[in-house]
């Protein structure tokens, strides 16, 4: 699918709450200039759950047009409704997405058997590579190792984004999955240990404002240069902590504003950071000296 750092793109909005496609294109070009290896549209960071179907399609079409095949474009198509997920994933395939990322059904809190049935139904309905997305802190349900192994047998299910935060689970997962099945880290503070376990990259929030640094970290790990990787990961930790000091994507949108990308406020029910939180984020960003170059 890809190796290295992929960015879970933030979605820019105007002051009146509409999509800001000019800023979105600018964000994409900055990512590509920094050698980011993939782009995710309409995921958690992209506020996919508060986008209309028309907005999602517009963003995806824009990303596909701007990237022009330079890197894979992965569509965040997961919902907690199987029929809607199938329809959204079919739309992504029709528009030309390179893959679809499917979060576990949230709120419903289905069983492992239900997860197998849900993801299999989607995979059967589309001719598109599918990435499973495990983020139980946000969804209330986790994919077990056994379920992942079962789903990996489906030819269209080709990748797994692991964001449980459990390094032991990551080890069990990598041991159990077949060779060649792509696994990606989903937590910026765990890029080093997850890639040490064999993840072939990261789908990152951090890389929105810090694409070059995130890609440099991933490249060091792919090259087994753990001395460089430890330095980069360590130096980035205060920034990562600040970017997750509030619910994603609240801080990362503030960070993008700080570097000159007017991505606007998150959509309700999310709101901007508190003054104290924002001040801490900006202080941390200004203290960070960078590790690239």
Swiss-Prot record:
Main location: cytoplasm
Annotated EC: 4.3.3.7
Active-site residues, as the UniProt record annotates them: 133, 161
Compartment annotation: Cytoplasm
Binding-site list for pyruvate: 45, 203
GO cellular component: cytosol
Pfam family, one: DHDPS
Reaction catalyzed: L-aspartate 4-semialdehyde + pyruvate = (2S,4S)-4-hydroxy-2,3,4,5-tetrahydrodipicolinate + H2O + H(+)
Gene Ontology molecular function terms on file: 4-hydroxy-tetrahydrodipicolinate synthase activity
Top-level taxon in the UniProt lineage: Bacteria
Keywords, sorted A to Z: Amino-acid biosynthesis, Cytoplasm, Diaminopimelate biosynthesis, Lyase, Lysine biosynthesis, Schiff base
Matches recorded under InterPro entries: Aldolase_TIM, DapA, DapA-like, Schiff_base-form_aldolases_AS, Schiff_base-form_aldolases_CS
Residues under site feature: Part of a proton relay during catalysis: 44, 107
Broad class of enzyme this protein falls into: lyase
Keyword flag Cytoplasm: yes
Pathway where it operates: Amino-acid biosynthesis; L-lysine biosynthesis via DAP pathway; (S)-tetrahydrodipicolinate from L-aspartate: step 3/4
GO biological process: diaminopimelate biosynthetic process; lysine biosynthetic process via diaminopimelate
Family as reported in the entry's similarity comment: Belongs to the DapA family.
Function: Catalyzes the condensation of (S)-aspartate-beta-semialdehyde [(S)-ASA] and pyruvate to 4-hydroxy-tetrahydrodipicolinate (HTPA).
Subunit structure: Homotetramer; dimer of dimers.
Protein known as: 4-hydroxy-tetrahydrodipicolinate synthase
Organism of origin: Exiguobacterium sibiricum (strain DSM 17290 / CCUG 55495 / CIP 109462 / JCM 13490 / 255-15)
Gene encoding the protein: dapA
């Amino acid at each position: 699918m890809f190796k290295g750092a992929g960015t879970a793109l933030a979605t820019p909005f105007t002051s009146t709450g509409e999509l800001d496609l000019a800023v979105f294109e600018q964000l994409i070009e900055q990512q590509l200039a920094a050698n980011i290896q993939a782009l995710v549209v309409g995921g958690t960071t992209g506020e996919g759950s508060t986008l209309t179907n028309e907005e999602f399609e517009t963003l995806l079409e824009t990303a596909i047009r701007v990237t022009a095949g330079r890197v894979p474009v992965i569509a965040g198509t997961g919902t907690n409704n199987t029929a809607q997920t199938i329809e959204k994933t079919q739309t992504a395939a029709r528009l030309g997405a390179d893959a679809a990322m499917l979060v576990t059904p949230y709120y419903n809190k289905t069983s492992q058997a239900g997860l197998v049935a849900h993801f299999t139904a989607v995979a059967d309905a589309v001719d598109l590579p599918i990435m499973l997305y495990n983020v139980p802190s946000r969804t209330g349900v986790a994919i077990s190792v056994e379920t992942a192994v079962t789903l990996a047998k489906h030819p269209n299910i080709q990748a797994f984004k692991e964001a449980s935060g459990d390094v032991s689970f990551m080890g069990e997962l990598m041991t159990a999955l077949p060779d060649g099945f792509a696994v990606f880290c989903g937590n910026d503070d765990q890029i080093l240990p997850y890639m040490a376990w064999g993840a072939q990259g990261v789908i990152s929030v951090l890389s929105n404002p810090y694409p070059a640094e995130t890609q440099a970290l991933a490249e060091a790990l792919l090259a087994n240069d753990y001395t460089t990787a430890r330095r980069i990961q360590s130096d980035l930790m205060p920034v990562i902590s600040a970017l997750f000091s509030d619910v994603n994507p609240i801080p990362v949108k503030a960070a993008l504003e700080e570097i000159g990308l007017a991505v606007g406020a998150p959509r309700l029910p999310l709101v901007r950071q508190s003054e104290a939180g924002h001040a801490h984020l900006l202080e941390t960003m200004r203290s960070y000296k960078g590790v690239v170059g």
